[in-house]
């Protein structure tokens, strides 16, 4: 029904970029990625500065395994809005599952590390980020496929964790408090946070 409604809206006003973008979102949810690509491409053709459509197009290219195209979409947004946190985040966390060679792995690892530095720099120099902007960025992607490189990721994961901590402290300062060392003999409780608890094939 959503597809039908948006297609009718496109017929009524084919030059409204937002409708094409929304139709693309529906097609993406349905797993019809090529149709989603066509919708997003039409949206940015109508409005070249439509940052959400560029980001959405990049996300679909990622699903299709076209990682360089995805990164190009995020770079376009950064050209339009240099401080766009979501695009920097998406670009940083874009990894192939399988690499052509070891050199390509090195390039993506450097991109990831450079991405953490860039976002830290944005946090140092920009104070306008809202809670929604930070949450939208962090939930847009993760570094899940970093582990597929088969390297020692401790250093990179520490930098990523420090960045996550810094971002969450900005929006949830009440949860960032010094904790006293537990000297009792009780078991330490460890919490896990993961989107897979909600959306996963085995849940």
Descriptions of predicted regions:
Residues 1-203:
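Alpha-helical solenoid repeat scaffolds of the TPR/TPR-like class and their adjacent stem/linker regions
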